[in-house]
């Protein structure tokens, strides 16, 4: 594969002692529950904004506008309302800014402290939303939820990457994405049940139940140790070595511990990680911590996850059918993520990126063509039962392609490629870019659908093609490489090597590769 610098596992990961212990498995499973926070919020919003009780309470003008338009708008534009989409997407702006603060706290006080803060903030937001009596209370609750998501998404992937042995780091890190998909599925099921409840109980229950994953994570945090990397970063060598011995299940950890110490010494020399990550020698990390989350959102996946009920209604599904279809796609998302857990450390990151990208391109084009055939440019048309089943099957194939590629790898790769001295900054950059474009897609998707019509699916297919080419030429394989030896991967890559071997941070010729 062009541009792929493959590293033999025996040359890196095989010389560390230890085994996969029950202790490290349990701690990683508990930590991964942080993904439930993000997943539940992604899945719940679309159902809540479709409840008339909720709209009557907080957005009566929007409800009247929608009722007055019935029968006069095209299928593509029937749900286009910026105020409603702002309710969904505003959380992610709060998460964006919180991720920068989380970077500093994670570095100074440890990954565990950031997870506790994230849990408390998310729990506070869930309580405020579930008990909201006015729009101000609702928005403040959304901001607290955003802070919780920002802290959890910044700290949990780092925690998992640092705790896991190199040979199964991918599988354990994907536990975070699996928890996200379980959260989405749980929200889809809640959305199916709660609209049947009267007197405003439905939307309150939907929003308030976000507190359940927050409590689970908060309780779990009290039983989690901090990572050896983080303990060492804060100056306690003896405790760090003891923790490394515990999670590796052996006293023979000298080689790995020495690598951690070397990385820590390098990190101590870095006083301003946000300045350092801009240096030439960190150009690969800067590139992937920026472009992977950017591309992840432009796969179009959150179109399905945010607005699944609305999207299915838009393309002709009935109310119950749209909610059931959202549950089905959520289940496919979970099962396909489980597939990635078993395949990521066997086939590698690049193989999953490329296969998943191809699958998403084909299915997006097929969905766009099907909708264009049935509704045309004017949005007038309808779907037969067979047509609806075909579109649902295509969307499920698309979700599966994402769930074993860009979904988990979008969190795994940025969290494992950065050296300790810029790791918190790199992960914070990853989260902030992800949150910004999550906000962008959430805010403007319904408007884009109204104006671009079925061509929107072609747009996302084109973006997936671009990102697949990007991965093919520029991403080296990181399977089985110990996290503190990741620098060797970049030095051996035919493009990134000129940056990673440039210890002085001088500018280099970008055209040399071409």
Curated annotation (Swiss-Prot):
* Activity modulation: Inhibited by uncouplers such as 2,4-dinitrophenol and carbonyl cyanide-m-chlorophenyl-hydrazone.
Bilayer topology = Multi-pass membrane protein
Is 4Fe-4S included in the keywords of this UniProt record?
no
Q: In which tissues is it expressed?
A: Specifically expressed in germinating pollen and pollen tube (at protein level).
The entry's localization annotation reads:
Cell membrane
* Topology, Cytoplasmic side: 1-19, 104-112, 159-169, 226-290, 342-350, 411-428, 475-514
- The primary site where this protein sits is membrane
Residues that span the membrane, as ranges: 20-40, 83-103, 113-133, 138-158, 170-190, 205-225, 291-311, 321-341, 351-371, 390-410, 429-449, 454-474
Q: Name one GO cellular component term.
A: pollen tube
- The segments annotated as topological domain Extracellular are 41-82, 134-137, 191-204, 312-320, 372-389, 450-453
Its biological purpose is as follows: Mediates an active uptake of hexoses, probably by sugar/hydrogen symport. Can transport glucose, galactose, mannose, xylose and 3-O-methylglucose, but not fructose and ribose.
User: Which family does the entry's similarity section mention?
Assistant: Belongs to the major facilitator superfamily. Sugar transporter (TC 2.A.1.1) family.
Task: Report the protein name in the record.
Answer: Sugar transport protein 11
The species this protein belongs to is Arabidopsis thaliana (Mouse-ear cress)
Q: What is the lineage of its organism?
A: Eukaryota, Viridiplantae, Streptophyta, Embryophyta, Tracheophyta
Gene it is expressed from: STP11
């Amino acid at each position: 594969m062009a541009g792929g610098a493959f590293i033999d596992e025996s040359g890196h990961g095989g010389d560390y002692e230890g085994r996969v212990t029950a202790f490290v498995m349990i701690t990683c499973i508990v930590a991964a529950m942080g993904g439930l926070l993000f997943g539940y919020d992604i899945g719940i919003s679309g159902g809540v904004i479709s409840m008339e009780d909720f709209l009557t309470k907080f957005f009566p003008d929007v409800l009247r506008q929608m009722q007055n338009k019935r029968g006069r708008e095209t299928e593509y534009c029937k749900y286009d309302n910026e105020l409603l989409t702002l309710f969904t997407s505003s959380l992610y702006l709060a998460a964006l800014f919180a991720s920068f603060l989380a970077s500093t706290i994670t570095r100074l006080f440890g990954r565990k402290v950031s997870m506790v803060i994230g849990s408390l903030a998310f729990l506070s937001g869930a309580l405020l939303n579930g008990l909201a009596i006015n729009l101000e209370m609702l928005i403040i609750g959304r901001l607290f939820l955003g802070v919780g998501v920002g802290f959890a998404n910044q700290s949990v992937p780092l925690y998992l990457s640092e705790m896991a042995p190199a040979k199964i780091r991918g599988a354990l890190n994907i536990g975070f994405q699996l928890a996200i998909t379980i959260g989405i599925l749980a929200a889809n099921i809640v959305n199916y049940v709660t609209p049947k409840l009267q007197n405003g109980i439905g939307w309150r229950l939907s929003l308030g139940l976000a507190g359940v994953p927050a409590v689970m994570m908060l309780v779990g945090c009290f039983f989690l140790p901090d990572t050896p990397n983080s303990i060492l970063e804060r100056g306690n060598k003896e405790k760090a070595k003891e923790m490394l011995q515990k999670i590796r299940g052996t006293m023979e950890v000298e080689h790995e511990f020495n690598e951690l110490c070397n990385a820590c010494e390098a990190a101590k020399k870095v006083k301003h990680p946000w300045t350092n990550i801009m240096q030439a020698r960190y150009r690969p990390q800067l590139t992937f911590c920026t472009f992977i989350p950017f591309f992840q959102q432009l796969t179009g996946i959150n179109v399905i996850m945010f607005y699944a009920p609305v999207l299915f209604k838009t393309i002709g599904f009935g109310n119950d059918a749209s909610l059931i279809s959202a549950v089905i796609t959520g289940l496919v998302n979970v099962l396909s993520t489980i597939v990635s857990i078993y395949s990521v450390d066997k086939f590698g990151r690049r193989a999953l990126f490329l296969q998943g990208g191809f699958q998403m391109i084909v299915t997006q084009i097929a969905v766009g063509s099907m909708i264009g055939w049935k509704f045309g440019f004017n949005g007038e048309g309808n779907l037969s039962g067979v047509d609806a089943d075909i579109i649902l099957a295509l969307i499920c194939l698309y979700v599966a392609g994402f769930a074993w590629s860009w979904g988990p790898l979008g969190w795994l790769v940025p969290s494992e490629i950065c050296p300790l001295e810029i790791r918190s900054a790199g992960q914070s950059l990853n989260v902030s870019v992800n949150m910004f474009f999550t906000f962008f897609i959430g805010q403007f998707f319904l408007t884009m659908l109204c104006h671009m019509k079925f061509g929107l699916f072609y747009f996302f297919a084109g973006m997936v093609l671009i990102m697949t080419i990007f991965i093919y030429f520029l991403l080296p394989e990181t399977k089985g490489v110990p996290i503190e030896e990741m620098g060797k991967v970049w030095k051996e890559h035919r493009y990134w090597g000129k940056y990673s071997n440039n210890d002085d941070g001088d500018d280099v010729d970008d055209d040399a590769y071409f």
